[in-house]
């Protein structure tokens, strides 16, 4: 996915904004994360979203593991309850990303620091008001230009044309109720220069301001279930007092996952 909103359930499919004290808090909630593959195998985990803090609990190598992405304290944590141990990585302010906060403007360069953007026009696309932008990026001595039509209401790209000729489109298909929640169903289509295309469907929850389900081609889907909107207790995002800090070399027997100890923790998707 070339766009800033590429979907990963161990990431996010909407452009995230850097967290700072000046930004509003995200909606707090808890939910079950369910992922299914074409062979019908399902994987489940539990997510807790606090005030600029996210906790994910899951099973790995027969052990419970907990990932915490704590933007308030600029750190990422990995907890292993069976060993009463944890690892910690400091996250610089400029690296912090909170996918639970909606984008605050339509300039696509606000998400890609090394790019330069120029506003070309205000238009209507797929029945929605958009602004058209040109983005210029210098990469390996080459100047790459792309076009982006950004939705004025949601600040997300409805259409993107990339230097290699590929095109990404996002269209609102209608309102639907999913697991008792009011959502909007969006269809995303990625077309390649050779004519091949991939289509996915996303259900966006206006209250949470994230997408709570995505269906991918081939039988993949991932979603949030049993969503409960409520403030989350602070202890979910702290290290228990009896836990010992260890280094990755000391952690055994399971190797740490590639989640919160990198730049991002696993998050649900956002439009």
Model-derived regions: residue spans:
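Short, cysteine-centered beta-strand-loop-beta hairpins and adjacent loop/turn segments enriched
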Residues: 38-39, 138-147, 192-196
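Positively charged n-region of N-terminal signal peptides that target proteins for export
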Residues: 1-5
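An acidic-aromatic
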Residues: 48-110, 121-161, 217-226
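Bacterial N-terminal signal peptides
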Residues: 7-16
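N-terminal cleavable signal peptides for secretion/export
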Residues: 19-55, 61-63, 83-84, 89, ...
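Non-transmembrane domains of secretory- and envelope-associated proteins
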Residues: 21-23, 38, 82, 125-126, ...
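A short, amphipathic edge element
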Residues: 107-119, 162-171
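Short, exposed beta-strand/loop patches in secreted or surface proteins that constitute
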Residues: 44-49, 68-69, 116-122, 171-176, ...
């Amino acid at each position: 996915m070339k766009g800033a909103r590429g979907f990963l359930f161990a990431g996010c499919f909407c452009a995230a904004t850097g967290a700072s004290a000046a930004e509003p808090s995200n909606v707090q909630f808890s939910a079950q994360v369910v992922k299914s593959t074409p062979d019908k195998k399902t994987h489940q985990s539990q997510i807790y979203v606090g005030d600029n803090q996210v906790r994910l609990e899951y099973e790995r190598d027969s052990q419970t593991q907990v990932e915490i992405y704590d933007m308030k304290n600029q750190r990422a944590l990995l907890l292993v309850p069976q060993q009463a141990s944890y690892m910690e990585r400091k996250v610089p302010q400029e690296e912090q990303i909170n996918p639970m906060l909606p984008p605050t403007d339509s300039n696509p360069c606000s998400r890609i620091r090394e790019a330069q953007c120029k506003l070309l026009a205000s238009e209507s696309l797929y029945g929605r008001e958009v602004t058209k932008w040109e983005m210029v990026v210098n990469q390996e001595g080459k100047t790459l230009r792309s076009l982006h039509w950004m939705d004025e209401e949601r600040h997300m790209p409805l259409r993107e044309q990339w230097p290699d000729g590929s095109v990404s489109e996002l269209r609102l298909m209608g309102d639907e109720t999913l697991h008792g929640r009011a959502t909007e169903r969006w269809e995303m289509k990625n077309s390649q220069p050779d004519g091949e295309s991939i289509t996915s469907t996303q259900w966006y929850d206006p209250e949470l301001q994230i997408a709570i389900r995505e269906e991918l081609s081939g039988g993949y889907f991932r979603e949030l279930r049993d969503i409960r909107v409520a403030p989350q207790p602070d202890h979910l995002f702290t290290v228990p007092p009896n836990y010992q800090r260890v280094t990755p070399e000391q952690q055994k027997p399971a190797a740490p996952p590639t989640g919160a100890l990198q730049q991002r923790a696993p998050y649900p998707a956002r439009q």
